[in-house]
Amino acid sequence: MGRQRQQRSRGSRSRRRVRKNISTAVVHIKSSFNNTIISVTDQEGNVIAWESAGSMGFKGSRKSTPYAAQMTAESAANKAMEHGVKRVDIQVKGHGSGRDMAARTFQAMGIEVLSIKDVTGQPHNGCRPPKRRRG
């Protein structure tokens, strides 16, 4: 008379990373006032690797520091080099404090930087900006 429970198979989904062999990639660095997100893509825009300061273990206000951006860029560069990336074009977006440090870290890791381009959007008188902080 008891209700029978259905057993769900909890098969482990093994995420296997397919090793691509890409020599030239595009690095997208989005640096906001709260976090730094780095995505490494191929020329078509398919993501090879990504990393953010939050996923690296930085919490709260430490995510927006240049040091967090440097560690995030090192981890993203290592993941990209596993796929054979030797040269990168860097696209920087945002006004955060980690944008310069992240771009410099890719050069320090031994990856040849072909170009650095700022793709931060400029509003054509769009949304009203937030009011100034008091203090």
Swiss-Prot record:
What is the top-level taxon of the source organism? Answer: Bacteria
Show the InterPro entries listed in the entry: Ribosomal_uS11, Ribosomal_uS11_bac-type, Ribosomal_uS11_sf
- Record-level Gene Ontology MF annotations: rRNA binding; structural constituent of ribosome
| Gene Ontology biological process terms in this record | translation
Region of interest called Disordered, as start-end residue ranges on this chain: 1-20
For this UniProt record, the keywords arranged alphabetically read as follows: Ribonucleoprotein, Ribosomal protein, RNA-binding, rRNA-binding
Gene3D superfamilies found in the cross-reference section: Ribosomal protein S11 (3.30.420.80)
Gene Ontology annotations for the cellular component aspect, listed alphabetically: ribonucleoprotein complex; ribosome
Entry similarity comment = Belongs to the universal ribosomal protein uS11 family.
> Subunit details for this protein?
Part of the 30S ribosomal subunit. Interacts with proteins S7 and S18. Binds to IF-3.
Matching NCBIfam families: PRK05309.1, uS11_bact
* Free-text function comment from the UniProt entry: Located on the platform of the 30S subunit, it bridges several disparate RNA helices of the 16S rRNA. Forms part of the Shine-Dalgarno cleft in the 70S ribosome.
Protein name listed in UniProt:
Small ribosomal subunit protein uS11
Please name the taxonomic classification of the source.
Bacteria, Bacillati, Actinomycetota, Rubrobacteria, Rubrobacterales
Q: Which gene encodes it?
A: rpsK
